[in-house]
Amino acid sequence: MNTSKTTTLIEKLVFDNKIHVVLNTGDRLTLPYDYTERIKKADKAQLQNYRLIGGGRGIHFPDIDEDISLNGILRYKTSHDLLAS
């Protein structure tokens, strides 16, 4: 059964002054480059070499041996957006 119509998944990443996590819903979540220590220390080429894992539930950056999940991103966004209010 294909659940991609009802499940929010990551489609791709876009890099500029922040990391934009583009979702299959059309929404974008933005992350700072200091989201994790490994991401903070990585250069742009290392970050652009990523692959989606878990059918879009996570991201693997092989050059820096880092995995991040959509659930973790959502928890981060929720806590940091609440702090900014």
Where are these regions (language model features)?
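Motif-centric detector for short Cys/His coordination patterns
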Residues: 1-85
